[in-house]
């Protein structure tokens, strides 16, 4: 008969399976004769489990078997005929293991005290000509220090490295679940858009790898998605979290009550790179991203202030961020609206 400890562990173990199929159709532009349409499809099955060692630590494991397809179709605007002019397919089996330690405690908007740590290894073996062989190791640790009931400090360090015949890419920049990102600046020049480099582009020859086998790394508020790209990544985040508006009651001209608005000061520093030479040779960085700053670097530094507001739908985050330029100086303020809890 199993012991009490064994019975508890059996109850707490968890396993699950998922089947998935997603398709996305999008425009790739047009010319005088044709509309070009891209279609992506991702389908497969995943098996996952968790084995706890204690109340605060566990071992996560699993594997995903997936197929991804990409097809470019051209639509003749005169004959109304559609034909396929490009097809691509990738197949992958991706096992993963992760050791997790988490003794953090949560407040209204996320963790306020304790420690979190994730050490994850995943790989994709060579299973044929359409496979994408890689091995990726990621380490993520987060420390929270509760000053008192309402004030706390948070620090995070994330490191990642991928190797293999077709290593994964890390896309550095942005914030989770951004809804609005105001016009930004790169080297003092105004730019716009969520992405520094477009993914869904007709000329992108690695679209399947970019969409399905790359990882977005954030937050790096004040930078766009894919502001830096590489097989290696390092990010450090620091926040001071505090109450901003506890309660407001306005009687005239209308009765308005609101409160529980929280604030935070933040500094985000990160880098993504393919070769360590990028840190010493700015020409490599300029050529890689189309920059002109003689001190261009894979390192990005941003800082700012933000608020968090509870709504009936989600926790809305409003951030104001500034970039620090490698040659000195700072960008104009950039305004970001996103939703989600604190990391």
Describe each PLM feature range:
Residues 13, 32-74, 82-84:
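Transmembrane beta-barrel wall of Gram-negative outer-membrane proteins
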Residues 148, 309-313:
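A generic beta-sheet turn/junction motif
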Residues 58-60, 152-154, 315-317:
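Membrane-spanning beta-strand positions in outer-membrane beta-barrel proteins
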Residues 1-7, 11:
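Single conserved hydrophobic/aromatic residue that forms the stacking wall/gate
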Residues 268:
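Short basic (Lys/Arg) and small-residue
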Residues 6, 42-44, 92-96, 114, ...:
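Transmembrane beta-barrel architecture of outer-membrane proteins
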Residues 17-25, 31-35, 83-88, 92-260, ...:
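C-terminal outer-membrane beta-barrel translocator/porin domains of Gram-negative envelope proteins
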Residues 96-99, 309, 332-343:
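Outer-membrane beta-barrel "beta-signal"
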């Amino acid at each position: 008969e199993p012991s009490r400890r064994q019975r508890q562990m059996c109850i707490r173990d968890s396993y699950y399976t998922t089947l998935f199929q997603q398709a996305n159709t999008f425009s790739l532009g047009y010319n005088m004769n044709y509309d070009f349409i891209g279609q992506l499809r991702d389908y497969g099955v995943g098996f996952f489990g968790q084995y706890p060692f204690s109340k605060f630590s566990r071992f996560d494991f699993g594997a995903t078997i997936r197929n991804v397809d990409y097809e470019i179709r051209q639509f003749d605007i005169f004959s109304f005929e559609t034909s396929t002019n490009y097809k691509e397919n990738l197949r992958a089996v991706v096992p993963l293991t992760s050791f997790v330690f988490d003794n953090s405690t949560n407040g209204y908007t996320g963790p306020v005290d304790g420690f979190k740590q994730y050490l994850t290894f995943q790989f994709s073996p060579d299973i044929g000509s359409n496979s994408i062989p890689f091995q990726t190791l990621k380490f993520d640790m987060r420390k929270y220090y509760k000053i008192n009931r309402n004030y706390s400090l948070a620090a995070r360090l994330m490191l990642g490295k991928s190797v293999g015949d077709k290593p994964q890419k890390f896309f550095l920049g942005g914030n989770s679940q951004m809804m609005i990102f105001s016009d930004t600046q790169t080297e003092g020049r105004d730019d716009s858009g969520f992405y520094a480099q477009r993914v869904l582009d007709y000329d992108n020859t690695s679209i399947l790898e970019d969409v399905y086998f790359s990882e977005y790394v954030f937050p790096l508020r004040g930078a766009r998605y894919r502001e830096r790209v590489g097989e290696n990544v390092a990010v450090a985040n620091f926040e001071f979290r505090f109450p901003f508006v506890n309660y407001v009651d306005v009687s005239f001209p209308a009765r308005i009550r609101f409160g529980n608005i929280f604030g935070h000061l933040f500094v985000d520093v990160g880098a993504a790179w393919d070769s360590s030479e990028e840190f010493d040779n700015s020409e490599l960085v300029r050529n890689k991203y189309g920059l002109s700053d003689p001190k261009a670097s894979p390192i990005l530094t941003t800082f700012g202030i933000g608020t968090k507001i509870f709504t009936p739908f989600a926790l809305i985050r409003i951030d104001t961020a500034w970039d620090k330029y490698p040659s000195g100086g700072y960008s104009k303020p950039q305004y970001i609206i996103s939703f989600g809890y604190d990391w």
